[in-house]
């Protein structure tokens, strides 16, 4: 099994699986059905991904919506079981995401970290709240990084690889990334990318800030997802993903709607190539990775097509 932390300097390739959208009700029949659905999904996805030996890790996000007061509504369940199950079937490592903003106390967060580590999951993406306008009960991301490092030392935990999210379009993002790196981030996962201008500018600025601060930059994992139709736009809007008009027209407004996913894959490959070419001159010290996301359940075949193309590309490196 490839160690995920060790792979961070060698173009890691990740696949992100959408979690099961459900919640436990206390009804034994319903809750048992959830477990069976998880087990079936583990076997189905594992079989689908078995043809990609170059895959480094399986990532599963946590789906959380917030109301107008910032209170959470959890829309996913058994994310650790899903990630661990698929990873074990494939002989890969699991990555799990956790929204830390809604943790009620230090003890609650510490308990979650300890439980996650005890389940053999040592790669964690710590995620903040949706907006700066709410006063959240939990730690911010840098604080969560520091708490995790503290628990590793005081509880004698395995070496946990800490990830955070970066939003290329957000103002001041390079500075935030620097602070999160200093507080313990080993890697960043970007929001889904459909153009390269914002991320190349961000990587250049982040590299310069790290150099001035004498800090080794974290690996930045670039996220991509295929689009199959205009129906995907609502989800992108909900996720806050920027899809430039020119790119939207190219992928989705073409006469051959059935070929939208192919144009989407080509666009992603072109964006990655542009970033990698820019890296040579402007941020050679920053290691890059690739994350292919399953945007929806029906997009899975197209996500696999995209993964196949990136898999071929990484094998050539």
Give the ranges of each region predicted by the language model.
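Structural preference for beta-strand elements that scaffold enzyme active sites
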Residues: 10-16, 55-59, 93-95, 122-125, ...
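Glycine-rich, proline-tolerant flexible connector loops at the mouths of alpha/beta enzymes
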Residues: 38, 50-77, 129-139, 190-206, ...
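Active-site pocket-lining/capping segments in soluble small-molecule metabolic enzymes
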Residues: 1-7, 31-51, 125-131, 137-167, ...
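Flavin-dependent oxidoreductase catalytic cores
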Residues: 2, 11, 70-97, 107, ...
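Active-site beta-loop-alpha junctions enriched in small/polar residues
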Residues: 16-23, 61-65, 97-102, 129-132, ...
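Glycine-rich anion/phosphate-binding loops
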Residues: 32-41, 75-78, 101-115
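Non-catalytic positions within long, well-ordered alpha-helices that form the structural scaffold/packing
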Residues: 50-51, 117, 181-182
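N-terminal amphipathic alpha-helix/helix-capping segment at the start of soluble metabolic enzymes
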Residues: 1-18, 22-35, 87
């Amino acid at each position: 099994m490839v160690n995920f932390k060790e792979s961070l300097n060698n173009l890691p390739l990740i696949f992100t699986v959408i979690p099961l959208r459900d919640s436990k009700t206390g009804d034994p029949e319903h809750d048992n059905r959830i477990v069976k659905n998880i087990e079936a999904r583990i076997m189905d996805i594992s079989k689908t991904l078995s043809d990609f030996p170059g895959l480094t890790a399986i990532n599963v996000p946590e789906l959380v919506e917030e109301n107008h007061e910032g209170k959470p509504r959890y829309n996913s369940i058994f994310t650790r079981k899903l990630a661990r199950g698929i990873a074990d079937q494939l002989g890969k490592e699991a990555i799990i995401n956790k929204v830390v903003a809604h943790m009620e106390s230090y003890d609650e967060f510490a308990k979650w970290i300890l439980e996650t580590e005890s389940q053999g999951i040592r790669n964690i993406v710590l995620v903040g709240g949706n907006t700066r306008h709410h006063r959240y009960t939990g730690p911010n991301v840098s604080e969560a990084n520091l708490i995790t490092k503290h628990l590793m030392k005081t509880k004698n935990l395995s070496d946990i690889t800490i990830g955070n999210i970066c939003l290329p379009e957000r103002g001041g993002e390079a500075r935030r990334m620097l602070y999160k790196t200093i507080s313990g981030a080993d890697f960043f996962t970007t929001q889904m990318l459909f153009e390269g201008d914002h991320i190349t500018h961000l990587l250049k600025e982040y590299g310069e800030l790290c150099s001035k601060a004498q800090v080794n930059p974290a690996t930045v994992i670039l996220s991509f997802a295929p689009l199959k139709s205009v129906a995907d736009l609502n989800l992108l809007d909900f996720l806050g993903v920027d899809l430039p008009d020119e790119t939207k027209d190219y992928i989705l407004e073409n006469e051959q709607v059935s070929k939208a996913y192919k144009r989407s894959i080509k666009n992603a490959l072109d964006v990655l190539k542009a970033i990698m070419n820019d890296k040579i001159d402007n941020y050679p010290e920053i290691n890059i990775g690739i994350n292919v996301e399953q945007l929806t359940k029906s997009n899975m075949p197209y996500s696999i097509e995209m993964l196949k193309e990136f898999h071929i590309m990484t094998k050539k490196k």
